């Protein structure tokens, strides 16, 4: 019996591209999504046939597209970054903004929490990476010199707490690895031929994967700063994530969601959306007229137990895939 992914359900509430999905580390029945509709939605997962989850709360306050969202490890707070140039910390119990982080001079494209939630990092079109405390104070800005020469599209903390590390990806085609203790450059990873949209760090902190315009995923050894190998995705890569419990890497591309087994370096899954069958299911057997439109996945994240893959699309829909056997 092979393991594969099947579409378990869909979640509708956003009215524009779903830019990011955050899942709780305790596997509780919530997720948080961000969108170009300028809102963040807290979902309660019901796992019903008709709808996999319901929008419990919509967090509003950003004045432009929300580009990224992450959850604190206790699941109490969400942190977002927006094209309005700000980060916001949200109390999920009340839906209120508890902190605004002001300092970037252009769109914020990416945000992340350190493992202990005491540090926050953000990346922007102003070409800087900023390190903040949870009070909203900017403690350090990585800019000129070793900094990126173009938009910084993605920034992530390594889960390896022994060697505190930040990894960033940029439109200057490089991935940079930073020592968190002194914010100094450890390695500059060169090999891509186009701008980068995304970087992901493996659960053990040993690897990172990067992708973007050139349609090639590069895998890097984080400790050594060396390229290990490449995987051909075949079209622009918008998001990457590692499975928490299988040696799998998932890529959201403009063609499909592609999943590789990193041991064999083979594609185990290539997930495409069937709008026709989705419409029929939704309308109770009557297809709708929008099956011609091209949609693709822009964001994805696994549940903490690795059983469920949440994927956000350009049509504002969150599609939920579950591990099945066939």
Curated annotation (Swiss-Prot):
Looking up InterPro entries in the UniProt record yields: G-protein_beta_WD-40_rep, RACK1-like, WD40/YVTN_repeat-like_dom_sf, WD40_repeat_CS, WD40_repeat_dom_sf, WD40_rpt
Q: Give the UniProt record's GO annotations in the biological process aspect.
A: cellular response to abscisic acid stimulus; positive regulation of signal transduction; root development; seed germination; shoot system development
Name the keywords, alphabetized: Repeat, Ribonucleoprotein, Ribosomal protein, Transducer, WD repeat
Q: In terms of domain of life, where is this protein from?
A: Eukaryota
Pfam families per UniProt: WD40
Q: Where are the WD repeats?
A: 13-53, 61-100, 103-142, 147-188, 191-230, 232-270, 290-326
- Its GO CC terms? cytosol; nucleolus; ribonucleoprotein complex; ribosome
Q: In which tissues is it expressed?
A: Widely expressed.
Q: What happens when the gene is disrupted?
A: No visible phenotype under normal growth condition.
Q: Please give the Gene Ontology molecular function terms for this protein.
A: MAP-kinase scaffold activity; ribosome binding; translation regulator activity
Q: Name the job this protein performs.
A: Minor component of the RACK1 regulatory proteins that play a role in multiple signal transduction pathways. Involved in multiple hormone responses and developmental processes. MAPK cascade scaffolding protein involved in the protease IV and ArgC signaling pathway but not the flg22 pathway.
Q: How does it assemble?
A: Homodimer and heterodimer with RACK1A or RACK1B. Interacts with GB1, MEKK1, MKK4, MKK5, MPK3 and MPK6, but not with GPA1 or MPK4.
Q: Family per UniProt?
A: Belongs to the WD repeat G protein beta family. Ribosomal protein RACK1 subfamily.
Question: This chain belongs to which protein, by name?
Answer: Small ribosomal subunit protein RACK1x
Q: Which organism is it from?
A: Arabidopsis thaliana
